[in-house]
Structure formats: C-alpha cells, structure tokens
Amino acid sequence: MADWDAAQYLKFADERTRPAADLLARVPLAAPARVVDLGCGPGNSTELLVARYPEAAILGLDTSPGMLAEARRRLPGVAFEQADVASLNPEPPPDLLFANAVLQWLPHHASLLPRLARSLAPGGCLAVQMPDNLEEPSHRLMRRVAGEPPFAARLAAAAASRTRIASFSEYDAWLTAAGCTVDIWRTTYVHALAGHRGIVEWVRGTGLRPFLDPLDAEAQAEFLARYEAALAEAYPPQADGRVLLPFPRLFLVARRTR
C-alpha cells in the first residue's frame, strides 16, 4: 500500500485517541522502565504514554515514514524508529508493549501475540486494542463494491488486508499458554458523523486504504460514489443530518507472570 496519510488519519484525532486512553487506563503498571508503542502512528498514543509514564524510556515504532514524521514533530523528545511489528524482537525486554489499532493489520495472531507476550520482562504487559468491525456495514459494503465491475479484478486481494479478529476464548487460551493473566473486553463506540460523507472520510484514513490504493483517481472517485450511496441505505440519518456509526473494538491486557 501507499504510505499512510497522517493528516487524513488525524481528521478524527479525538475519536481515534479515545480507545488508546481507555486501553491505557487498564494497564496495571505503576512505573515501567521501558515502554514500546507498536504502530505508534502520528504519536497520539505515544503522547498518552509519555503523560502517564514521564520517567520511562519510551520508543515509538511504525512502518510509515509519514506517520513517523508527524510523531517526531509532535514529540521531539521521544525516540521513534521505522520498524515492522511482525518481525519485532525487542531487546532488552520491555515492561510494556502498547499496540493500539495496529495488530488487526497483521496475520497469525495465534503465534504473533504469544511471541510478543514472551518478549516482555517478567511482570510486563502487552496491551492491545483492535477494531472489530469487519462485519459492520461500513466494511461489508467496501467488500461488496470491490466485488463489482470494474473493480473486482484490481481489488481481489483488498479484503484480505485485515486479519480476522479471534474470539475472547482464543485470545485468552493463546496468552494464558504464554504465561500471562489476561483481561479482555469489547466496547462499541458510537460516533456521530457529518452525514454519510463523514463515514467515508473516517474510513479513508484506515479501512478504505487497501481498496483505494490500487485504483487510479477516476476509479477511486467512482468507487467512493458507489460506496457512499450504499452507506446511505445502511445508515439512516438523524433528524439533523448526522449519521451514527457504531464502531466495536476488542481490548486485551496480558500480564506476564512466568
């Protein structure tokens, strides 16, 4: 995919940061020495970590040069590096791995999450938040439009870019076997957006990227027009024109006990 657009992502900065704050509130660590923000994006989650743990050595990691540039602008005193979470082997072992809205882009959760948990220092935490919205109309309709002509051939792989979120029992079993106690929950946020175009603008910064990046400008415009029309059928507006977008997210905090 093309590089992430930090400005597009930050159009909804407050809404995207709230789940990170909710995740951090459940982390049971008073004074971790080493904290790594996995998929730090433009630094909005890193900023929360700096505020809570001002004495910690904090490192933000992301694959996107654009996101890292924005993170460095926001937090010039924090270390940021370009790195792939999928192959991460942190040394020395961190006390907190914080993964807000990143692991849904990576496959093989049955092996990935236990590997990350085992990389922690004793007593350390893996804190994860992932959008769990693949079966919401906002995402089902992306796949439906992508399967129509003239998009189907060019977008055949787009739907596979996101990983299926597993069940509570699967994550609990995988992380318990890795020597952790597990706190897991699901929250549905309801975002009031400015019409159906508001939903389009929201997902353009994240979920729509695999569907738009393979298309030229003309095809993108046609895709977005069809997608917005489909959204208008799925999300009835409020009396004042706002549209309510339910957005479920899965959270877990795994603490290494052995």
Swiss-Prot record:
Enzyme Commission number, as recorded: 2.1.1.144
Organism: Methylobacterium nodulans (strain LMG 21967 / CNCM I-2342 / ORS 2060)
A cellular-component GO term for this protein: cytoplasm
Reaction it catalyzes: trans-aconitate + S-adenosyl-L-methionine = (E)-3-(methoxycarbonyl)pent-2-enedioate + S-adenosyl-L-homocysteine
Gene Ontology MF terms: trans-aconitate 2-methyltransferase activity
Keyword Transport assigned: no
Any GO BP: methylation
Annotated InterPro entries: Methyltransf_25, SAM-dependent_MTases_sf, Trans-aconitate_MeTrfase, Trans_acon_MeTrfase_C
UniProt superkingdom: Bacteria
Descriptive protein name: Trans-aconitate 2-methyltransferase
Family of this protein: Belongs to the methyltransferase superfamily. Tam family.
Keywords: Cytoplasm, Methyltransferase, S-adenosyl-L-methionine, Transferase
PANTHER family tied to this protein: TRANS-ACONITATE 2-METHYLTRANSFERASE, TRANS-ACONITATE 2-METHYLTRANSFERASE-RELATED
SUPFAM superfamilies registered for this protein in UniProt: S-adenosyl-L-methionine-dependent methyltransferases (SSF53335)
Statement: the UniProt record of this protein carries the keyword S-adenosyl-L-methionine: yes
